[in-house]
């Protein structure tokens, strides 16, 4: 089971992601893989992401 990126806090809309906002957790359904954390630092979320929410590819601007 691979870990996904999960919000460690409420991330407001248009906020650039930092390491402290995220944690790796095994969740279902899977979201952005935890190994992509270095790649998504500095990318903005396109919606508010509540604490404990799995980050999905469509929540992060320019995540392919």
UniProtKB/Swiss-Prot annotation:
<dbReference type="InterPro" id="IPR036732">
    <property type="entry name" value="AFP_Neu5c_C_sf"/>
</dbReference>
<keyword id="KW-0047">Antifreeze protein</keyword>
<feature type="domain" description="AFP-like">
    <location>
        <begin position="4"/>
        <end position="63"/>
    </location>
</feature>
<keyword id="KW-0964">Secreted</keyword>
<dbReference type="InterPro" id="IPR013974">
    <property type="entry name" value="SAF"/>
</dbReference>
<feature type="site" description="Important for ice-binding">
    <location>
        <position position="14"/>
    </location>
</feature>
<dbReference type="InterPro" id="IPR006013">
    <property type="entry name" value="Antifreeze_III"/>
</dbReference>
<dbReference type="InterPro" id="IPR006190">
    <property type="entry name" value="AFP_Neu5c_C"/>
</dbReference>
<feature type="site" description="Important for ice-binding">
    <location>
        <position position="18"/>
    </location>
</feature>
<comment type="function">
    <text>Contributes to protect fish blood from freezing at subzero sea water temperatures. Lowers the blood freezing point. Binds to nascent ice crystals and prevents further growth.</text>
</comment>
<dbReference type="GO" id="GO:0005576">
    <property type="term" value="C:extracellular region"/>
</dbReference>
<comment type="similarity">
    <text>Belongs to the type-III AFP family.</text>
</comment>
<feature type="site" description="Important for ice-binding">
    <location>
        <position position="9"/>
    </location>
</feature>
<protein>
    <recommendedName>
        <fullName>Ice-structuring protein RD2</fullName>
    </recommendedName>
</protein>
<feature type="site" description="Important for ice-binding">
    <location>
        <position position="44"/>
    </location>
</feature>
<dbReference type="Pfam" id="PF08666">
    <property type="entry name" value="SAF"/>
</dbReference>
């Amino acid at each position: 089971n691979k870990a996904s990126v999960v919000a460690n806090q409420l991330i407001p809309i248009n906020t650039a992601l930092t390491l402290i906002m995220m944690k790796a957790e095994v969740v279902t359904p899977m979201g952005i893989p935890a190994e992509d954390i270095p790649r998504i630092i500095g990318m903005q979320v396109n919606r508010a992401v509540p604490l404990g929410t799995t980050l999905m590819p469509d929540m992060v601007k320019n995540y392919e």
